[in-house]
Amino acid sequence: MRLSTATLLLLLASCLSPGHGILEAHYTNLKCRCSGVISTVVGLNIIDRIQVTPPGNGCPKTEVVIWTKMKKVICVNPRAKWLQRLLRHVQSKSLSSTPQAPVSKRRAA
């Protein structure tokens, strides 16, 4: 009888212990899209789409995924200087090309 009680308590304790940190410590988290990244420059003429995914949803790192026009997926190092310049350029283009909302003039009463 004692053996089954001890086994039951051990099973209960293992169910209540946090396991989230253990998986991240051993890098066994499979929710990241990129298993490896490159830092070499990707030609602008072959880029179809860029996606930047911040840490979260089970992946502890920022990921930058580039889809080429040939439907190839490339994971790029988010700290690569050429990529940082490209993202700043794209962001400034999108901000400058956004039309401004119309402003209605009100008369003072």
Swiss-Prot record:
One of its GO terms (cellular component) is extracellular space. Pfam families: IL8. Found in spleen (B-cell-rich zone or follicles), Peyer patches (strongest within germinal centers and extending to the mantle zone) and lymph nodes (in reticular pattern in follicles). GO terms for molecular function: CCR10 chemokine receptor binding; chemokine activity; CXCR3 chemokine receptor binding; CXCR5 chemokine receptor binding; fibroblast growth factor binding; heparin binding; receptor ligand activity. Keywords: Chemotaxis, Cytokine, Disulfide bond, Inflammatory response, Secreted, Signal. InterPro entries: Chemokine_b/g/d, Chemokine_CXC, Chemokine_CXC_CS, Chemokine_IL8-like_dom, CXC_Chemokine_domain, Interleukin_8-like_sf. It is found in: Secreted. GO terms for biological process: B cell chemotaxis; B cell chemotaxis across high endothelial venule; cell-cell signaling; chemokine-mediated signaling pathway; defense response to bacterium; endothelial cell chemotaxis to fibroblast growth factor; immune response; inflammatory response. Its main location: secreted. PANTHER family: C-X-C MOTIF CHEMOKINE 13, SMALL INDUCIBLE CYTOKINE A. Strongly chemotactic for B-lymphocytes, weakly for spleen monocytes and macrophages but no chemotactic activity for granulocytes. Binds to BLR1/CXCR5. May play a role in directing the migration of B-lymphocytes to follicles in secondary lymphoid organs. Belongs to the intercrine alpha (chemokine CxC) family. This is C-X-C motif chemokine 13. The gene is Cxcl13.
